[in-house]
Amino acid sequence: MKPQVLIEKMNESERKAFDSLGRYKFEMFGYWSSTWVKYNQLAFDMGIIDKKNPNPFKDLVNQAKNITDEA
């Protein structure tokens, strides 16, 4: 796979994840967000990027943790 194609796929996965979440498609959000994580790992392992990109879903994860801690 060409480096630029992998980066484009990673960007597409992020867009689709947030789009899915915004439309209450939670299962598809999980699919696309995990795809982004995998592409990020592949890009790093293949030397396409020097270090992993920050996870764009981290704030959502932290918010979910805060909600469950309050319950």
Question: Residue spans of the language-model regions?
Answer:
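C-terminal-biased regions
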Residues: 1-22, 27-71
